[in-house]
Amino acid sequence: MYKGIIKFVKRETLHEEFVINIGIFNRPSTAERFRKMLQEANVGYDVLLILERI
């Protein structure tokens, strides 16, 4: 199982704007699909996924 965290980094300044705990996932690919969806909806940001194995 994996604990997922999403970070929004503003592209222009590379400043971290938001950090969101997205919960627990059985597979990393599920969290990656969620990250990709957020990235497509927020073009001014780089959306980073951090996974921690628990």
Where are the predicted features?
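Short intrinsically disordered terminal tails
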Residues: 1, 15, 52-54
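A short beta-strand micro-motif
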Residues: 2-10
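Intrinsic disorder/low-complexity segments
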Residues: 10-11, 24, 52
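A short, exposed loop/beta-hairpin motif centered on an aromatic-Gly-Thr core
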Residues: 16-29
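Short, mixed-charge low-complexity intrinsically disordered segments
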Residues: 37-54
